[in-house]
Amino acid sequence: MSSTYRLQLSKQFRFDDAVARAGYFASFGVAHLYCSPVLQAAPGSNHGYDVVDPTRVAEELGGEVALRRLVAALHEHEHELALLVDIVPNHMATAGRANPWWWDMLQNGPSSRYANYFDIDWESPISAVKGKVLLGVLGDRYGKELERGALTLQREGSEAVVRYHDQMFPLSPESLDGLELDAVNRDTDALDAILERQHYRLSYWRSAQEQLNYRRFFTIDSLIGLRVEEPQVFDDSHRVILGLIADGSVGGLRIDHVDGLRDPVSYLRRLRSAVPDTYLVVEKILATNEELPDSFPVHGTTGYDFIAQVDGLFVDAGNEGSLTALYHAFTGQSQPFSEVVRTCKQEMMASELAVDVERLTNLLLDICDRHRRHRDRTRRELQEAIRELAAGLHVYRTYVRPGSPASEQDQRQISIAAEGAAGRRPDIDADLLAFVADLLLMRHEGVAEAEFTARFQQLTPAVMAKGVEDTAFYRYNRLVSLNEVGGDPGVFGHSVEEFHSYCSRIAAKWPATMLTLSTHDTKRSGDVRARTNLLSEIPAEWEFAVRRWAERNERHRVQGYPDRNLEYLMYQTMVGAWPVDEVRLVAFLQKAAREAKVHTSWINPVPAFDDALTRFAGSVMADAEFKSDLESFIGRHQLVALGRVASLAQTTLLLTCPGVPDLYQGSEVWNLSLVDPDNRRPVDYERLAGLLPEIRSAGPSDVLARSDEGAPKLWLITRLLHERRVDPDLFGSASYTPLAAVGAKAKHAVGFVRDRLLVVVPRLVAGLGGDWADTTIDLPAGSWRSLITGGEEQGGPGVPVAGLMHQFPVAVLARRARPL
């Protein structure tokens, strides 16, 4: 595995579309085509993570026949490409009849052969739901929908079903005896009686938020948890994928949301046993100072940890105080990010995740009742303890398992959470917090105790994802390039030493982990972040511009909306993604506002605010004087050109640091995408396929002259991927030695040596100003060939960095032969 290229498959870009582009993918040097999920998803799915039938390849993508055409097309090139695919073991989409397992379960209830495939609590403490599954699908209360005739019985082919608008639900066999559909539809009481006999209970969606009795993917009711910890469920849900690996069609897997599983370690061991030689990476988001568990039998993560390290390297930490003061003064927001996080987590657990907390509370009540020192605990105090511990956990989850001692990392995280909870909440009994912490480390044996730990470990990833990624990241806007999946906006930049420490650790422990700068889930593309990071280097100029723009745009504000925090986000977004049109900007701001959940939200939209925001953004975009000022600011500070230099530097690190580089579709040239769905727009492969042969043999000056086309980035990627393909050992060395620079601009250089490979790139490029002055590095002994320019350098002390980069903004050299 030397490199991957991520493709988002959909009905707009199917297997055969990828076949048509196979020559392009092969020609610029990628080794693996890395596809979004390929199994049958819900009708109309545009991403594939809502699988409804894992036993067949997605028909909307072309089915198995088209998939095999793609495999054949990838294999027929001189340099064969392999296929890496995304799998979703954590959940499935309900999607009615489209999901045969779900349909059978709804029809037959607990007696269905698929009843235990889904993570359903058939013994719900709510009597009306016991033995049933609650479905929050109604737009109003059940009685009102029933009485207005929205629920009817109909015949669909040979089946009698319940219809609610465009949704259908099966009738249980035992309720069909003597059933006359027309007669029942005319009699509300009779219809009510029939519905009561089903193995599901139809409910108003708002009420269901407090009564659902199944595990979801985060807070999405239509994505139900799958119990892959059961051998039969694992076998049935993985049979097709494992078959594609066995016959050579697929050469690697990305495991989506591994933290949602009951026991990720056991799952990964079972998967590894089935595919002992297959490349495996997990979508695991690591917190600051967290490491991937050694117990995971995988090659690494999908690369969000690399994003955090690289982004931090290009932020000027010395200006944290200035930008923090500006943010506080301009927006009135003064909470540190850690407090914003805790607040958002608590809000999510009190609202959209309340039903999951309630289930844990019920378990804890039962446990406490059997431990005499805690049997007098009230539901309220137990719930408070659970919420406080979950809110204080700094990682997505722990991995404590029955029969195995908790790792030092897990013990440390639980200890930190418990100590923090005790300090923040002296009103919660310290003995109770200590008891729950011991439960979470499995220091108390028992079935209920193990269940509590497992459920808590499945809850906290949802709390983190919804509370932090999908809420706090949209509330705390100090420098939004840091608001990235896997990042910590509270950490303002990383030192060069921290970056080297990370790379050294990866080289030693996870040399084949995936590296990336952009994904289908990133909030902003790597290029948008690279440009936005430059603001950290010009805080005074940025403040002057923001205050000037705010004063001018006050006339566009609608009834005081939006607030300054959202306005500040807008200015950063416009600078980072410019040129951005009104449609894209408004869509981004609307999503940001609803995710922040301050003035509006997805669940409780406020039309007046949404309209005011749309009108404000539209007026700002139509203001010619403002746009001229914005473009003048961007041009005066050379943010486009400098952002491109930073992008080339980051791309070089992506392609040369320890690990396997992944390129997100369209990112082989400049890509100024925002959060989904903006980052899933179609890629113009016709243009890229035409550009590639034009620049393949061009020199540095020629491609730099075509910078607006993205030529420098595509040229750099093509050259380095070619080198990775023809000389994999050059990039596969486990050695990693930091290379120090000396001189006036030393802090602007990042360099390292990996045996025969030497890399030097610029950082903090606004302050560098394109002038390396007297900055030098010591080039190790030997004859070095530039992989960028083809030039030769001889090893020795005091080699000027300016000389290494006089033709192109980065330097990548390979040693021809070791000195005698």
Where on the chain are the PLM-derived regions?
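Long, basic N-terminal domains or extensions that often function
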Residues: 93, 110-179, 196
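Catalytic P-loop NTPase motifs of RecA-like helicase/translocase cores
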Residues: 91, 261-262
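Short glycine-biased active-site loop of nucleotidyltransferases that positions the nucleotide triphosphate
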Residues: 43-47, 94-95
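Activation on extended, non-transmembrane soluble regions of large proteins
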Residues: 23, 81, 125-128
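Conserved short loop/turn motifs at secondary-structure junctions
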Residues: 254-261, 705
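Hydrophobic or amphipathic alpha-helical targeting/insertion segments
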Residues: 70-120
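Carbohydrate-interacting/catalytic domains
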Residues: 1-43, 51, 55, 60, ...
